[in-house]
């Protein structure tokens, strides 16, 4: 079983500080590479919230139609989607079967994909490294196993996605203290 919720909440300040200090240059460059395409941000559970943020920020930053979708939605995409969009796979631990199936499906469809995971050693990372399915920005969350609500993973993902799109060098776009 995961951590008690009070432990998760006590960890949040350290998580925010950690996420604010991680390098996002690789993910930022990958996003910029596909700035001329729409974004199909793939996430399930808490990562779907991160996918929704990524889709919104991609639309605002580049004016490209973007959408948060579940891994199951990847299987229902029109064939032409890979011509006009790139995938972004978000997964805290990179081990859920639905996310792995979505990565495989994006590869089969020829849809370029990037992604973010909070574990540098996971089935998603190994699959992507072996097949080129996605260019992943991998981080190693220092708080260990999340509790049921995955509060720290969610907060870290949101901050990393936000920092990817809204450069810390831009005035007025700093994380609150």
Task: Report the location of each language-model feature.
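Glycine-rich phosphate-binding loops that contact phosphosugars or nucleotide phosphates
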Residues: 33-176
């Amino acid at each position: 079983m995961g951590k008690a919720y009070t432990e998760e909440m006590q960890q949040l300040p350290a998580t925010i500080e950690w996420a604010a200090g991680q390098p996002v240059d690789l993910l930022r460059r990958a996003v910029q590479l596909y700035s001329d395409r729409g974004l199909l941000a793939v996430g399930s559970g808490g990562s779907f919230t991160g996918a929704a943020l990524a889709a919104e920020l991609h639309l605002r930053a580049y004016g490209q139609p973007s959408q948060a979708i579940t891994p199951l939605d990847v299987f229902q995409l029109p064939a032409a989607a890979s011509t006009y969009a790139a995938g972004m796979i978000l997964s805290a631990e990179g081990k859920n079967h639905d996310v792995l199936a979505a990565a495989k499906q994006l590869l089969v469809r020829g849809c370029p994909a990037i992604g973010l995971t909070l574990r540098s050693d996971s089935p998603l990372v190994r699959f992507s490294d072996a097949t080129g399915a996605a260019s992943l920005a991998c981080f190693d969350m220092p708080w260990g196993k999340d509790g049921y609500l995955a509060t720290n993973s969610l907060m870290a993902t949101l901050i990393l996605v936000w920092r990817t799109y809204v450069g810390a060098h831009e005035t007025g776009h700093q994380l609150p203290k």
